[in-house]
Amino acid sequence: MGIRLLCRVAFCFLAVGLVDVKVTQSSRYLVKRTGEKVFLECVQDMDHENMFWYRQDPGLGLRLIYFSYDVKMKEKGDIPEGYSVSREKKERFSLILESASTNQTSMYLCASSL
């Protein structure tokens, strides 16, 4: 019984190791003047349908800004005000701040899933 369980656990770890998803966000650090338009790009390489933009402020958890479940299909999250998004290609999801303000100073995170 013990060796079969060990083999199953090892197989699970091997299966997890075969998946190498890459989600790239640009820019890592970005400083803009108040009122400027800001573009944040997110690119994933696993042909995922779903992509998400989150914001995390000090002392708070992640808050969903926008999500997309396919090309040109986008939905507002919990805090969409002041933001827009674009998804013309499956692998790319852009977050746009039309007019940057000091209350948008934050850490922005992009994610993707099947």
Swiss-Prot record:
Primary location recorded for the protein, binned into one broad class: membrane
A cellular-component GO term for this protein: plasma membrane
Leader sequence segment: 1-26
Keyword Coiled coil (UniProt): no
Record keywords: Adaptive immunity, Cell membrane, Disulfide bond, Glycoprotein, Immunity, Immunoglobulin domain, Membrane, Receptor, Signal, T cell receptor
Disulfide feature: 42-110
UniProt-annotated glycosylation sites, renumbered to this chain: 103
Task performed by this protein: V region of the variable domain of T cell receptor (TR) beta chain that participates in the antigen recognition. Alpha-beta T cell receptors are antigen specific receptors which are essential to the immune response and are present on the cell surface of T lymphocytes. Recognize peptide-major histocompatibility (MH) (pMH) complexes that are displayed by antigen presenting cells (APC), a prerequisite for efficient T cell adaptive immunity against pathogens.
PANTHER family documented for this protein: T CELL RECEPTOR BETA VARIABLE 28 (PTHR23268:SF121), T-CELL RECEPTOR BETA CHAIN (PTHR23268)
Name the UniProt record assigns to this protein: T cell receptor beta variable 28
Gene: TRBV28
